[in-house]
Amino acid sequence: MTVTPSFIEYVLVDLFAGDPAITARPMFGAVGLYFEGKIFGIISADQVYFKADKSNIRSFVSRGSEQFSYMKNGIEHRLPYWLLPAEILENPHLLMKWAKKSSMIELNSN
């Protein structure tokens, strides 16, 4: 799950144009992405994942996205984060729109 510093810089500077509303912080071997202090995504293994729920999951699934998962003690754990499609990464307007939408999602801690 390593994340290279150059990839974090690419995400923050190149993809989000250095927008000060977008920040990144290390978390559990990955990096959390925040919009105005609210987590909306993660970077893991130099891949970008955005938070999803019933309000936006179809946008990810219809584009062939995969859900973030990791193995712990031989058990696969899935988190409500989905791989960001390349077409969204390459479109600054859509990227910010998706980031804002994902930042509004409140996850239940069951």
Each language-model region and where it sits:
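Charge-dense, helix-prone N-terminal extensions
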Residues: 1-110
